[in-house]
Amino acid sequence: MPAERDMKILVVDDFAATRKILINTLAQLGYNNTDEADDGYSALVKLKSAIFDFVVLEWNMPKMSGMELLEQIRAVPNLKQIPVLMVTEDGLQENIVAAVKAGLNAYVIKPVEVNNFAKKIEKIFE
């Protein structure tokens, strides 16, 4: 695993403004090696064609939800070990439990607060 600040991170969200906020938040934390995808399908293409150390994805996306993307990531042998942090407006406990059972490493409820986001990332890699 590369040093934390050198990690290549894929940010997946259907809203460009949200991707920008997440990428800027990661940059504030010293994570500058980011790429982005606007849906689950393009995220899978990127994940299969490049090496990523970490994925931040949105729960609610058209075409392929964050949950479906998580399941796809966990189903591919060379991707299943990549840590995934899900960002969601939906804090429903049953959804969170289902995502954790599917292999989610951590989640953050929107709006994303920098210190909480940092703590979640640190916990994944401790």
Go through each PLM region and give its residues.
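Acidic, metal-coordinating helix/loop segments flanking the phosphotransfer/catalytic sites
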Residues: 36-54
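His-Asp phosphorelay/catalytic-motif detector in bacterial-type signaling
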Residues: 5, 51-53, 78-83
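Acidic catalytic/metal-coordinating carboxylates
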Residues: 39-42, 65-71
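C-terminal output helix
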Residues: 112-121
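Receiver (REC) domain active-site loop signature in two-component systems and cognate sites
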Residues: 61
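Conserved acidic segment of CheY-like receiver
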Residues: 6-17, 22-26, 55
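Alpha4 helix (beta4-alpha4-beta5 surface) of REC/receiver domains from two-component response regulators
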Residues: 68, 91-106
